[in-house]
Each structure stands twice: as C-alpha cells, then as structure tokens.
Amino acid sequence: RMSLVVDIEKKLGSFTLRSQFETDSGTMALLGASGCGKSVTLKCIAGIMTPDRGRIVLNGRVLFDSEKRTDLTPQQRRVGYLFQQYALFPNMTVEQNILCGIREGSRSEKRALAAEKLRMFRLEGLEKKHPAQLSGGQQQRVALARILCSEPQAILLDEPFSALDSYLKWNLELELSDLLAGFHGPILWVSH
C-alpha cells in the first residue's frame, strides 16, 4: 500500500514546528501562511533537512526515526522534490537535465527513457535548448520529467507556481494535474 506517514518536530527560531499527517496515494495539500513551516516539512521528508525528533515512513520503509537513529540520505529516500525555481542545471540542455534523473540502465536505455519523457511532457524539439531559453511552464515540465525518470515513490511540490500571475498559475496547475495523473504514489503540494 502506498502511504506517507509524517510525525516530526523541528525547532525554527522562536517556535517549534510540529507536523503530523498521513496520506495514501493521491494528492494532499499543505496550506498555511508564509514562514509557518510547510517547505521545512517537505525538506525533512526529502532528507534535505533533519527533524529534531519524530518519524517519517514512506510505503512501510522508515526514512527517518530519531529514536532508532535512522536517517536515510536524500538519494536513498526515492522522493522527487520539485523546488520553487525548478533547480534545473543552467549549463545543460533539456535532454541532459532529464538524463540526470536516470540512475540505471545502459546509455541507449537511458536515452530511450529520456526520449519517452520528452514526448510525454511535450518537450520534443527543445532537447538541445538550455533552461534560460524556455518558458516557466517548459522549465517546470523539464523538472517534472527529470523527477519521474528517477522513479520516485512520492513527489513533493514546493509552491511550484509562487512566482506566476494567477491566470498562468491556473493553467499550469491544470497541466500539472494532467501530467501527474498517472503517478501512483503520494503527492504532497505546498501552497499559501
């Protein structure tokens, strides 16, 4: 059964963040004012930050447990993280960025998977372009294609549309929902 169980505490300046929830496959949103700890929660799940105490379990596998001193590296967690600014490598082409997400397989298998993701995310013809030459929506699709190439068990979306105007934001939210419709694990979406 696909599930994500989070029960953590993290001291943040003058307050202690307490994040406790459980979700199965499907989309769940974390909503709240800026600075309340939504992004910190995602970073703790991804292994980018370490909670002070608690436990994080993904699909029955313990990612973090303060009592048992378990703290898997980000690479071991199999969690896809879409940053606010997409975190594409500016010196690499679209194709190279997507290839970075593929861990296993021969060179030809990796190229075939990258080509499949280019088609799936409607990025054909942009393979040799660099991120700076792409629109925000195209950059987001490249980042998502790269994430899905790594076969994550959960996807974390950290305010993916925070910098966009409301009309563009609405269109990209619809597009993102379509692109993630085939993903069968938990999807955690942070917004404010």
Indicate where each model-derived feature is located.
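A short, proline-enriched helix->beta-strand linker immediately N-terminal to the Walker B motif
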Residues: C149-Q153
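Conserved ABC ATPase signature
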Residues: H130-L134, Q138
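Short coil-to-helix segment of the ABC ATPase nucleotide-binding domain corresponding to the Q-loop/switch region
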Residues: N91-G101
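Hydrophobic anchor residue at the start of the ABC signature
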Residues: L144
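Catalytic Walker B motif of ABC-type/P-loop ATPase nucleotide-binding domains
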Residues: I155-E159
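Conserved ABC ATPase "signature" region
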Residues: R61-S66, E109-L126, S177-D178
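ABC ATPase NBD coupling module
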Residues: L63-G80, E104-A112
